[in-house]
From Swiss-Prot:
InterPro entries: FadA (IPR012805), Thiolase (IPR002155), Thiolase-like (IPR016039), Thiolase-like_sf_Thiolase (IPR050215), Thiolase_acyl_enz_int_AS (IPR020615), Thiolase_AS (IPR020610), Thiolase_C (IPR020617), Thiolase_CS (IPR020613). Pathway: Lipid metabolism; fatty acid beta-oxidation. Keywords: Acyltransferase, Cytoplasm, Fatty acid metabolism, Lipid degradation, Lipid metabolism, Transferase. It catalyses: an acyl-CoA + acetyl-CoA = a 3-oxoacyl-CoA + CoA. The gene is fadA. One of its GO terms (molecular function) is acetyl-CoA C-acyltransferase activity. Catalyzes the final step of fatty acid oxidation in which acetyl-CoA is released and the CoA ester of a fatty acid two carbons shorter is formed. Its EC number is 2.3.1.16. This is 3-ketoacyl-CoA thiolase.
């Protein structure tokens, strides 16, 4: 494949093991320490990359307060081998934050404003809860549906509009755990998980190289027994078909194709296009549809050209309508989230965009795909998507 000098390539990807937010492996690890460990280990793994060449560390994080405040990107960078002369910024696009970090780095490279970037994101939802310090504007209900900030209810709405049944959602949730467990047993996550020290359920320090969120004993019967989590009267969305609340971080080394060639590095993939899109906040989960369609148009590709998809599983009731309208629902078992998704692995907000993109690149590498799309919905009505081509 012939690459242009300013093409944007992904050199490597790593992530932490995903930890439960309640008493999980990361309960005694701060968000910036988790981030710094990941960045340091990924740079050690790629010793052709001089940390002094890093133009900017661009880190996604949603709830930027407490240990995640005061520009956590810089806080984490200062704890690594990256010199003080490199810059750092923290970005938030809610659920799409670290994919936005990737897009920001890509746009800088394309416009000759840097060659080497560290991107990724973190969310320690055990230490900084989802709603900590949040004060929504009371006048917002004059402009958007009152329940637009309640993601579970927006998923209920989207599922109802598209005729998604409770049984379909339970089957999707089961699939996520089964595929994530299978991927773990087969070593499919080995290249992406950077081992970290943490604490087990008995309080003993140990090294984790696996996700503690996956429930291999999940069954349709156990899922069917769960009560609706958001709408007690007639709701279909449960805890078992929603993304888990977890702690985690993800990281990528991104650079220009020219710099990768100069350093003798074989990239994982090149970015072919990027897009964001807005939708009605009341159906925020539908955002991946227009974002993906826009990204594919920019890449000159069609849905049929895409070998693999990673769609963030915010809710089964949200993911299924997206797959249906993207016309890949009938190809789901061959193309979509082959290593499970956020229902099994969790959705640490600032981490997830880079996480699903990196997992996609590993799926493509392991299965021989050429084109892949990572996409996700975003709270308050947005979608984001990236089209990759394997190099």
């Amino acid at each position: 494949m012939s690459l242009n000098p300013r093409d944007v390539v992904i050199v490597d990807f790593g992530r932490t093991p995903m930890g439960r937010s309640k008493g999980g492996m990361h309960r005694n690890t701060r968000a910036e320490d988790m981030s710094a460990h990941l960045i340091s280990k990924l740079l050690e793994r790629n010793n052709k990359v001089d940390p002094a060449e890093v133009e900017d560390v661009i880190w996604g994080c949603v709830n930027q307060t407490l240990e995640q405040g005061w520009n956590i990107a810089r806080m984490a960078s200062l704890l690594t081998q990256i010199p003080h002369t490199s810059a750092a910024q923290t970005v938030s696009r809610l659920c799409g934050s670290s994919m936005s970090a990737l897009h920001t780095a890509a746009q800088a490279i394309m416009t000759n404003n840097g060659d080497v970037f560290i991107i990724g994101g973190v969310e320690h939802m055990g230490h900084v809860s989802m709603m900590h310090g949040v004060d929504p504007n009371p006048h917002m209900s004059l402009h958007a549906a009152k329940a637009s900030g309640m993601m579970g209810l927006t998923a209920e709405m989207l599922g109802k509009m598209h005729g998604i049944t409770r049984e379909q959602q339970d089957a999707f949730g089961l699939r996520s755990h089964q595929l994530a467990h299978k991927a773990t047993l087969e070593g499919k996550f080995k290249d992406e998980i950077i081992p970290m020290q943490g604490y087990d359920e008995n309080g003993f320090l140990k090294v984790f190289d696996y996700d503690e969120t996956i429930r291999p004993d999940t069954t349709l019967e156990s899922l069917a027994a769960l009560k609706p989590a958001f709408n007690p009267k007639g709701g279909t969305v449960t805890a078992g078909t929603s993304s888990q609340i977890t702690d985690g971080a993800s990281c990528m080394i991104v650079m220009s194709a020219q710099r990768a060639q100069d350093l003798g590095i074989q990239p994982m993939a090149v970015i072919r296009s990027m897009a964001v899109a807005g939708v009605d906040p009341a159906i925020m989960g539908y955002g991946p549809v227009p974002a993906t369609q826009k990204a594919l148009k920019r890449a000159g590709l069609s849905i049929a050209d895409i070998d693999f998809f990673e769609l963030n599983e915010a809710f089964a009731a949200q993911a299924l309508p997206v797959l249906k309208d993207l016309k890949v629902l009938d190809k789901m078992n061959e193309k979509v989230n082959l290593h499970g998704g956020a229902i099994a692995l969790g959705h640490p907000f600032g981490c997830s965009g880079a996480r699903i993109s990196g997992t996609l690149l590993n799926v493509m590498k392991q299965n021989g795909g050429t084109f892949g799309v990572s996409t996700m919905c975003i709270g308050l009505g947005q979608g984001i998507a990236t089209v990759f081509e394997r190099v």
